[in-house]
Amino acid sequence: MQKQVVVMDEAAIKRALTRVSYEIIERNKGTKNLALVGIKTRGIYLAERLHKRILEIEGIDVPVGDIDITLYRDDLSFKDDKTREPAVHGTNIPFDINGKKVVLVDDVLYTGRTVRAAMDALMDVGRPAQIHLAVLADRGHRELPIRADYVGKNIPTSGNERVEVRLTDVDNEEDAVIINKNE
């Protein structure tokens, strides 16, 4: 039997993203040379929301892009097992990342493997001056030495729990962060 527990509702997500936006601005001493890159899929929408908040706070339009890490994963999945073709969605970074302070944005930080793949993919696009990581939820259980610079909420979990982020933009459901517990 699976039990769902909502740990962040729409209002909590909005507050967390506002706080993270302020933290990004403060840590980078403004928005000069700053860029946001969302990791597909939900990281893209969270990066857009951070972009909107930073624009409201600073009045500066920080560049936003998105990155597809499919070919960089160590657990590559295929859209068709017969042809062994990976399901690639494409990267869209319409600005030069060389010398920029890039904030990678994702929904959940777990093992660190997604972030490692995103950094590899980003380095193939250019050479940023810095790479920071912003996540909505950090659930622990790292397998790689990766730590988020900006965290919406730390959510300690056990091995039989899964953290799921639902966003209106993608899931057509109310924004929420949910822990699914197998009992």
From Swiss-Prot:
Enzymatic reactions: UMP + diphosphate = 5-phospho-alpha-D-ribose 1-diphosphate + uracil
Alphabetical list of SUPFAM superfamilies matching this protein: PRTase-like
A biological-process GO annotation: DNA-templated transcription termination
Record's keyword annotation contains Transferase: yes
Keyword Transcription regulation recorded: yes
EC assignment: 2.4.2.9
Pfam family, one: Pribosyltran
Keyword terms: Glycosyltransferase, RNA-binding, Transcription, Transcription regulation, Transcription termination, Transferase
Top-level taxon of origin: Bacteria
Motif (PRPP-binding): 102-114
Annotated GO MF terms: RNA binding; uracil phosphoribosyltransferase activity
Residue sites binding substrate per the record: T41, R42, D106, D107, V108, L109, Y110, T111, G112, R113, T114, R139, V163
Family assignment from sequence similarity: Belongs to the purine/pyrimidine phosphoribosyltransferase family. PyrR subfamily.
General function of this protein: Regulates transcriptional attenuation of the pyrimidine nucleotide (pyr) operon by binding in a uridine-dependent manner to specific sites on pyr mRNA. This disrupts an antiterminator hairpin in the RNA and favors formation of a downstream transcription terminator, leading to a reduced expression of downstream genes. Also displays a weak uracil phosphoribosyltransferase activity which is not physiologically significant.
Subunit structure: Homodimer and homohexamer; in equilibrium.
UniProt name for this protein: Bifunctional protein PyrR
Lineage, top ranks: Bacteria, Bacillati, Bacillota, Bacilli, Bacillales
